[in-house]
């Protein structure tokens, strides 16, 4: 097998020749199995039971986004008012989920839906969904200045 001296010189030059050097540290792997077992033990202490026939779950956030769980596992302990949702959430906009979430919307989210419908009818792209919230919502909250107590602010 013939050896090309140019390629050999190039490879030797590219190879890092270090004697001694620093040790390459292995990255610590965060194991979630331990966290999962702790969670399972905590739910076991609360006597949580698996809730069947839950196909999906949606959590509406204050910023107008929705955490959507397509396949979700739900465990609940009604006595301690504790419920655990397990699965992989996807962050989506309300506009992406409108056909699926109409039956799930409560009274607090109907205002957001109305604003969204108005924006779509006006031909505008949906902007921030909470933009229509009352701007003066903090009228009764006084501004604090450094060194003052909240009771003394007029």
Curated annotation (Swiss-Prot):
Pfam families: NAC
A GO BP annotation: protein transport
Keywords, comma-separated and alphabetical: Cytoplasm, Nucleus, Protein transport, Repressor, Transcription, Transcription regulation, Transport
Main location: cytoplasm
GO cellular component terms given for this protein: cytoplasm; nucleus
InterPro entries documented for this protein: BTF3 (IPR039370), NAC_A/B_dom_sf (IPR038187), Nas_poly-pep-assoc_cplx_dom (IPR002715)
Annotated CDD domains: NAC_BTF3
Superkingdom, taxonomy of origin: Eukaryota
Region (Disordered): 125-154
All residue ranges annotated as the NAC-A/B domain in the record: 33-98
Subunit structure: Part of the nascent polypeptide-associated complex (NAC), consisting of EGD2 and EGD1. NAC associates with ribosomes via EGD1.
Function: Component of the nascent polypeptide-associated complex (NAC), a dynamic component of the ribosomal exit tunnel, protecting the emerging polypeptides from interaction with other cytoplasmic proteins to ensure appropriate nascent protein targeting. The NAC complex also promotes mitochondrial protein import by enhancing productive ribosome interactions with the outer mitochondrial membrane and blocks the inappropriate interaction of ribosomes translating non-secretory nascent polypeptides with translocation sites in the membrane of the endoplasmic reticulum.
Family membership: Belongs to the NAC-beta family.
Name recorded for this polypeptide: Nascent polypeptide-associated complex subunit beta
Protein species of origin: Scheffersomyces stipitis (strain ATCC 58785 / CBS 6054 / NBRC 10063 / NRRL Y-11545)
């Amino acid at each position: 097998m013939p050896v090309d001296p140019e390629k050999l010189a190039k490879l030797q030059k590219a190879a890092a020749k270090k004697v001694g050097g620093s040790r390459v540290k292995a990255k610590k792997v965060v194991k979630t199995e331990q966290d999962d077992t702790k969670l399972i033990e905590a739910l076991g202490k609360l006597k949580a039971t698996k809730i069947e026939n839950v196909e999906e779950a949606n959590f509406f956030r204050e910023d107008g986004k929705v955490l959507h769980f397509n396949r979700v596992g739900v465990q609940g302990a009604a006595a301690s008012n504790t419920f655990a949702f397990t699965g992989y959430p996807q962050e989506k906009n309300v506009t992406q989920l409108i056909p699926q979430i109409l039956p799930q919307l409560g009274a607090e989210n109907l205002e957001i839906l109305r604003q969204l419908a108005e924006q779509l009818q006006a031909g505008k792209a949906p902007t921030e969904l909470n933009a229509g919230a009352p701007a003066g919502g903090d009228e009764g909250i006084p501004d604090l200045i450094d060194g003052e107590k909240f009771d003394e602010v007029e």
